[in-house]
Amino acid sequence: MDLSTYILSDTPLQINRMHMCTWDIKGCKAFVEFGFDFSVEASQKNEICLIVASSFISEADTTEDLYEQIVSKENLAFIFNDQYKGKKEVNHGPHSVGCDISFTIQKEMRFLPISKIETHNGYSKLIIKNWSTATSNYIRFCIDTNYDVLATIQHDITRTLHIYDVRINSLRNLPKFIESFLDNRMELCRKISKCYMLHAVPSEYIICHHEEGFKSLRIVEHEKFYAYLSKKRELKADENTIAFNKLQAQDGEYSFCTEFEHERVGTQQLLVAIGCNLLCSIFFAIGSILHPTQSGAPWYNNMPVLYWIAIVIIIGLIIYLVVCARKKK
């Protein structure tokens, strides 16, 4: 799965922090969270159009605004690792259009609901209103995909490898539909000061490769995440771990590669075990087979029919395993 992701906007944005978390867990389809802490200079526009584009997004997916969950006092402390200090509603007329939240350590931020969401093949389009120019602003949303897993998967006889190769705003292989956005008054958000990349996977997966930005691997706090994620997804105690990566870049272009592996007892493993067992049985009997008999008949005439059958099975297993190995290449 190509996880290259592009962030575009029709308004110049300073993205102070970008959060992206992939969830490949048991019991549900894969989903991805995005969070943006951004600042806006004075603008005459009434709304901002933000586009998150990636090949894993399709029009059949659901993009859910997580505003109601994120402004909960308990969830704020959990997600931002800081103590909630106070909240002030931002009202336009009788309706709340966001809230200004202060923390003990971090600066005050305005949390905004997403005014409009559209999900298309290859991208999600978000309309944001009522932002603050005095403080930074924050939105968070989740894309529920139709994929079982988002990782690139490679198999061998004893293990399965899950590769998460995520690139943000990579110009190396810019898709044509991104170029069409750039031709239509949109621009890549190149000012992304920090990027946080997280991957939630089943706990039996073992991290086997990571790059410079890797920070930690922890057990998912299932009760807190269960409440935070709308209680729509099954999260069981100690069943999932989450890998945390963090990088800073001047040009807004990021690259993260994290690999997990897990051992498995698959069909090929069982076939290898059967083949080894048959081969060992033949080796144990080879002395008596090669021992000359009184009739002087060749040794292969002394071999029981069952041994010939075992040899044919072993040859068949070798051919099968070689063919499987070539198909994977």
Protein language model annotation of sequence segments:
Residues 36-42, 54-56, 143-149, 201-203, ...:
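Beta-strand elements of well-folded, non-transmembrane domains
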